[in-house]
């Protein structure tokens, strides 16, 4: 598994983030100014509410400390790149989805370490915290997440036609890489996979559904439009599973720490597709 975790996993994540960068332009970042309320409702839901809901669940749920930390890792991860596609299927605000995914992914260099260190302290895992360097965690994420996104954006800026042509293919490769990483994580724990899925599967299902519902109604309460509500709900339901597995592997050595990312990564597509079907049916009726 060392070749997979030491070489393939970081390269796969870097390519996925590069593919994200290929699709970004300056307007995706200016949307924070043009649609400040919609953006900040989405960002707060994902960066603050999602980890809080996850933390409450792991505190009341009878799971091991390792699995609890694994749940917090997936909750701390930014939105997945496929959220843009599913937002489109749901007839949501795709432009807002792209902005949320891009900016929160870039902010993850700060938010993920902060959320994880805070969670470990609150969960009483001080011994684990002592073995983690906040600086090295942020630096690793900067190199694997931020730098590839910036490279993708630069490529788009100076070779736009080539970037546009390659973007669709790159996103397909990203999906394949994500599946390979997910299967690798599952196979690495094949001896314990059934018990892990039994322990972590239901809590990740509850977290996913609960957060999509909360995000949808928080957005409604704060007066965002219907397309924006759909977008924010999907953004809070689809997390970057590859990044979660990378963090769990590099910081905690894999094992039970990365297991919650596996069922969550499967569940989130099912629940998101159900959500898409429901909102499209509602729109047509």
What are the functions of these language-model segments?
Residues 1-285:
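Alpha-helical transmembrane segments of multi-pass small-molecule/ion transporters
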